[in-house]
């Protein structure tokens, strides 16, 4: 086929967009076909130079351009890096030669177009050209000047579809924030009709009367001065993208951010952030709006003229606009009037006090009942309560927003309490010199079970313990003295760590050895049951006579589970035993049997398993307490509790004082040591309400 036939066979074809190609593009294609045909037939040009055949290995290779221009991109022709390119100069399109728009990858859909421009990189928000760029219809920087006519979409469509001037600032109002928020770029929305009618393209070319918008602003002229927050700047998170083997910057930034989040997952919030009471580094995002006017601004709906993000909440509408930047506390005490519902609720003298378990993160002791109902918690109070009480929208009469700050934390509350022990785990390893005598403790437990329970219940407990006895023998037969000492060190080290958890959780909690001996107890458990901590740990004499039966024997026979006088003469003479209290001494008969049956299944079974059931705790009652339980004064006190409810810690201590039992729901689990032997038992107790008792599934 000759060249003329090829020319006649070539017809204008539509491009990918469906439009007919430019005739100049068709001429360029015909010229390319002619050169190719001459190279195939003749092999060389008439002047003796090398052929331009694409398959000729001696042909000089053209360097591939980084990005083709718009005209060459549409024509699918090779372009160059120079602007204007040689093809556009040849066609007379040098004035309109600019880079073509590439299709974004999926992971770059959320990135603005301006951030993908060459030379901008991660400094898009700090780039000087950013203020002079118009916005396209989707809010990103446009690269084509013809796209300015499609821009101007507002956040909420109005009948005129007027655009917003986002990046260009005008004169700041006195209600703006004095500090820069690092959460997002600052938006200063104009709420007047004139400001909202200006388009983005016209606002760039108009001279600005405000020097803060036309030139580099100073700190005194513009409190928003300073670099914009760039969330894509890798220097913000202290990792170098050049050291990562990634072909694209956004992939390396995402990988670095995941690594930054993983390494900082265990960090605790700084003390300065706690004192400020802020979310983030210096506060929330700043949106300077004027909701007093009738025109909706950024974040406002044109229907109800209310802020879209914050709604009608008067507390959030009172966010400060003029408090000093160094002041980081919020005054919440003035928002709600003191003589309103809270003061009316606490003014009753006969109202039951709340049972305060925990007072703060720096104190591990429960506050007294007299200090718990106090309303004043160290908040700064001002005249804001009157403004909020009488204003429906929470605004004062003069239209200025009062400053609400977070509660000022006391400096001494952030320090460690006096009663908190010095945390030095080295003392645990230095103090343990001998292994713990588990064999003797199991013998003492067996003797106590035989004295306390009937023969039938003793047989049930013995069967449960006999089922796990071979496992104990198999796991301990290879252990020598050093292993047993190390086992005790592990127990003491774990217990040393658990004591802080027990004091901080505020739930009645006890920790036992595998023999059932109490090793640690919380204050709330002592309040609930009346058992002192020193008595439970074996540091004080155990004078308890409550075994779960009736205090006065009935005629004929004694009740099941009552105390039987089968105790040795030595123990009668010396009730102060040198060992801690067993768990079986704290539960009634049925609860003890159920516990050991569950313990036999869980001791060497599921290492992460737990048991949740109900039980009856036995109150610590001496002979004097048993006599007091039968008096008329105690009967009147129980009636008072049924009518008025719990009144502080004294009321908690009086639960079950009549019959000596407290019905509880408790959950416990077994923790094993490094030898896979049950090491300790952790128990949490809860007093169920009347509605909760009927819905317990166990």
Swiss-Prot record:
Transmembrane helix in keyword set = no
Kindly report the protein's main subcellular placement as a broad class.
Answer: nucleus
Its family remark reads:
Belongs to the ERT1/acuK family.
- Show which residues constitute the signal peptide: none
Question: Per UniProt, which keywords does this protein have?
Answer: Activator, DNA-binding, Gluconeogenesis, Metal-binding, Nucleus, Transcription, Transcription regulation, Zinc
Physiological role = Transcription factor which regulates nonfermentable carbon utilization. Activator of gluconeogenetic genes.
Name of protein? Transcription activator of gluconeogenesis acuK
Xref: PANTHER family: TRANSCRIPTION ACTIVATOR OF GLUCONEOGENESIS ERT1, ZN(II)2CYS6 TRANSCRIPTION FACTOR (EUROFUNG)-RELATED
- The residue ranges flagged as biased composition, category Polar residues, are 38-55, 137-223, 269-293
What CDD domains does the annotation carry? Answer: GAL4
Give the species this sequence originates from. Aspergillus clavatus (strain ATCC 1007 / CBS 513.65 / DSM 816 / NCTC 3887 / NRRL 1 / QM 1276 / 107)
The GO terms describing molecular function are:
DNA-binding transcription factor activity, RNA polymerase II-specific; RNA polymerase II transcription regulatory region sequence-specific DNA binding; zinc ion binding
Q: Which residues bind DNA?
A: 69-97
Residue segments, region Disordered: 1-62, 137-229, 264-305, 388-422
């Amino acid at each position: 086929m000759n060249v003329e036939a090829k020319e006649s066979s070539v017809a204008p074809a539509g491009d990918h967009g469906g439009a007919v190609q430019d005739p100049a593009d068709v001429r360029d294609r015909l010229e390319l076909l002619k050169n190719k045909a001459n190279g195939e037939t003749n092999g060389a040009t008439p002047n003796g130079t090398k052929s331009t055949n694409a398959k000729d290995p001696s042909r000089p290779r053209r360097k591939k351009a980084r990005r083709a221009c718009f005209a060459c991109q549409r024509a699918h022709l090779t372009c160059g890096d120079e602007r204007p390119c040689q093809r556009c100069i040849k066609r007379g399109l040098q004035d309109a030669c600019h880079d073509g728009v590439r299709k974004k990858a999926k992971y770059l859909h959320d990135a603005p177009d301006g951030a993908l421009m060459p030379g901008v990189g991660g400094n898009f928000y700090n780039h000087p050209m950013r203020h002079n760029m118009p916005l396209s219809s989707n809010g990103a920087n446009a690269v084509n000047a013809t796209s300015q006519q499609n821009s101007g979409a507002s956040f909420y469509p109005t009948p005129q579809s007027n655009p917003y001037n986002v990046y260009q600032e005008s004169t700041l109002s006195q209600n703006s924030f004095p500090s820069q928020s690092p959460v997002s770029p600052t938006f200063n929305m104009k709420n007047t009709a004139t400001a909202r009618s200006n388009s983005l393209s016209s606002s760039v070319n108009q001279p600005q009367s405000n020097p803060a918008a036309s030139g580099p602003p100073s700190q005194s002229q513009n409190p928003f001065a300073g670099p914009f927050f760039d969330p894509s700047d890798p220097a913000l998170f202290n990792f170098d993208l050049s050291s990562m083997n990634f072909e694209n910057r956004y992939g390396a930034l995402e990988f670095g951010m995941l690594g930054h989040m993983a390494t900082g997952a265990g960090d605790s919030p700084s003390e300065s952030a706690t004192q400020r009471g802020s979310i983030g580094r210096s506060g929330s995002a700043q949106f300077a709006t004027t909701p007093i006017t009738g025109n909706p601004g950024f974040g406002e709906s044109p229907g109800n003229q209310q802020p879209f993000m914050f709604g009608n909440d008067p507390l959030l509408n009172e966010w400060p606009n003029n408090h000093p930047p160094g002041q980081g506390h919020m005054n919440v005490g003035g928002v709600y009037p003191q003589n309103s519902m809270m003061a009316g609720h606490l003014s009753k003298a006969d109202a039951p006090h709340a049972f305060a378990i925990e007072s703060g993160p720096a104190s591990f002791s429960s506050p007294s009942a007299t200090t718990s109902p106090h309303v004043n918690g160290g908040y700064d109070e001002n005249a804001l309560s009157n403004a909020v009480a009488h204003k429906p929208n929470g605004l004062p009469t003069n239209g200025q927003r009062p400053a609400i700050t977070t509660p000022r934390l006391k400096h001494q509350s952030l320090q460690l309490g006096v009663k908190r022990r010095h945390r030095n785990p080295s003392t645990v390893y230095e103090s343990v010199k001998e292994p713990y005598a588990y064999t003797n403790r199991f013998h003492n437990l067996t003797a106590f079970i035989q004295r306390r329970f009937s023969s039938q219940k003793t047989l049930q407990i013995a069967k449960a313990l006999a089922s796990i006895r071979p496992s104990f023998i198999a796991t301990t037969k290879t252990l020598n003295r050093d292993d047993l000492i190390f086992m005790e060190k592990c127990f003491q080290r774990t217990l040393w760590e658990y004591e802080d958890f027990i004091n901080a959780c505020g739930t009645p909690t006890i920790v036992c050895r595998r023999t059932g001996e109490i090793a640690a107890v919380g204050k709330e458990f002592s309040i609930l049951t009346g058992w002192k901590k020193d008595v439970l740990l074996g540091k004080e004499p155990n004078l308890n006579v409550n075994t779960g039966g009736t205090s006065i024997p009935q005629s004929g026979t004694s009740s099941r589970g009552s105390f039987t006088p089968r105790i040795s003469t030595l123990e009668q003479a010396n009730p102060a035993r040198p060992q801690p209290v067993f768990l079986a001494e704290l539960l009634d008969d049925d609860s003890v049997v159920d516990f050991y049956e569950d313990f036999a299944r869980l001791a060497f079974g599921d290492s992460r398993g737990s048991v949740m059931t109900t039980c009856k705790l036995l109150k610590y009652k001496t002979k004097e307490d048993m006599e007091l339980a039968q008096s008329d004064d105690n009967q009147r006190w129980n009636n008072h509790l049924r009518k008025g409810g719990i009144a502080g810690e004294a009321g908690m201590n009086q639960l079950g004082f009549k019959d000596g039992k407290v019905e509880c729901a408790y959950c416990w689990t077994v923790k094993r040591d490094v030898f896979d032997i049950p090491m300790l038992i952790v128990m949490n107790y809860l007093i169920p309400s009347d509605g909760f008792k009927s819905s317990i599934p166990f």
